A protein has these predicted regions:
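Iron-sulfur (Fe-S) cluster-binding modules
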Residues: 23, 49, 64-66
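A generic structural signal for beta-strand entry/edge sites
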Residues: 1, 28, 59-63
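Amphipathic alpha-helical interaction surfaces in cytosolic regulatory modules
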Residues: 13-20, 36-49
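Short glycine-rich, basic-tinged beta-strand/loop micro-motifs
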Residues: 22-34
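C-terminal edge-of-domain segments
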Residues: 53-67
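An N-terminal amphipathic alpha-helical segment
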Residues: 1-25
């Protein structure tokens, strides 16, 4: 599965990387973020684009599967 590693990046970089993946990836992909507000922003952004989002906490970080 394609993976966007946005851990440690400042906003709006996680959203920009997610948007690029939405444009280029045909199937599901994973986004990794390190901050709760990044998780919230990426999740809302993907849902606003009509995507299904599954969120999982991995330690102090987050994994979002976007389909």
């Amino acid at each position: 599965m394609y993976e966007v590693d946005a851990r440690g990046l400042s906003c709006p970089q996680p959203l920009m990387l997610t948007n690029e993946a939405l444009k280029t990836q045909k199937g599901a992909f994973k986004v990794l973020v390190s901050e709760p507000h990044q998780k919230t922003n990426v999740e809302k952004f993907a849902k606003d684009k009509g995507k299904k989002v599954t969120v999982k906490a991995v330690g102090s970080e987050f994994e979002l599967i976007i389909e």
